Amino acid sequence: SHADTPLLLTSIPDPWRHRLLVGAAADYFFGNRVSGAVAALAIGAVPIERKRVGRRSADMARGLVNDGWSILLYPEGGRSPDGWGQEFRGGAAFLAIRCNVPVVPIHLQGTGRILRKGRTLPRPSRTTITFGDPLVAAEGENARAFASRLQAAVAALGDEATSDWWQARRRAHAGTSPGLTGPDVGAWRRTWALGDRDRRSRRKRRRW
């Protein structure tokens, strides 16, 4: 959702927020000079190819990281059409490996209700943002394997958002965390399942 970035920029702690750039789809936000300038000024966007991260993007990211900046990236490469997550692409993992930096996984719950893809006006709703522990690529780990590990970490955070920390940790340890992409069923059943998940998130009360 286009609501993700504004919410994250107001939720990330100050020491990192003021040195944070947003990796934005080059083909969408930087299609012309005007839109690129607006994105850069409004949210601190920098262009990233979402289909295949090239050497130019990798070198730019490395230079920014070396200068002390953090980069917010969306590993799915685009917005969800129905509110469920999508499979992670390897671009974010590739950049993390090239830059030799840790990745902090973040899960956002409910932003699709605020501003779903195709909608122009936001509407009030409740969201949950869950931050995980930093992850570092293992020695010799390739981008695809690291991306899978990042996706599993975000799935565990999504489980925590609808249950509790202890149960989510147990399922993550057992490898049984609910997937981000939702059930492989018809469209109406996916919509119902997403609504049920959101209702559980709204009813949840943290134990600490």
Q: What would you call each of these model-derived segments?
A:
Residues 55-208:
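Non-catalytic C-terminal accessory region of glycerolipid acyltransferases
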Residues 1-52:
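Catalytic core of membrane glycerolipid acyltransferases/transacylases, capturing the structured
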